Amino acid sequence: MSQTLQAAYAAKRKARRFAVQGIYEWQMSHNPVHEIEARTRAENAMHKVDLNYYHELLTQVIAQHEDLDALLIPVLDREIDALDGVELATLRLGAYELRDHLEIPYRVVLDEAIELAKHFGGADSHKYINGVLDRLSSTLRSAEKQQAK
């Protein structure tokens, strides 16, 4: 893999990390998304972050959270209100990528969400995130999953 491609992957990974933190903050505080984004950009070194992708994830996941929740609810084993805040933010981000970014292979979406859960979530959050998003990918990416088998 070229260094340019590696840098692009790393920039998207960093965008996801900042986005999940912003989504979590919004869930807890309901601060306006533009304030969350402005503060995050002001307080962090973001020169190696895909800023366009960060902006998209943060704004679109928050704007579409009800639609994303409607996708998640059928594949959850508990009420959505019972989810840990970090898990919910990560699941919403993963659901958004599965639904709206078909150019990203579903396994990459799952792997990235698992890494977010390992970094920010509880001890076994990554296992739960993997299970939920795998079930959701069976609905949203069924043809892709069949080809991968």
UniProtKB/Swiss-Prot annotation:
UniProt keywords, alphabetically: RNA-binding, Transcription, Transcription antitermination, Transcription regulation
Alphabetized InterPro entries for the sequence: NusB-like_sf, NusB_fam, NusB_RsmB_TIM44
GO biological process: DNA-templated transcription termination; transcription antitermination
Disulfide cysteine pairs (residue numbers): none
Zinc-finger recorded as keyword: no
GO molecular function: RNA binding
Gene Ontology cellular component terms for the protein in this record: cytosol
Function text: Involved in transcription antitermination. Required for transcription of ribosomal RNA (rRNA) genes. Binds specifically to the boxA antiterminator sequence of the ribosomal RNA (rrn) operons.
Name of this chain's protein: Transcription antitermination protein NusB
Organism: Acinetobacter baumannii (strain ATCC 17978 / DSM 105126 / CIP 53.77 / LMG 1025 / NCDC KC755 / 5377)
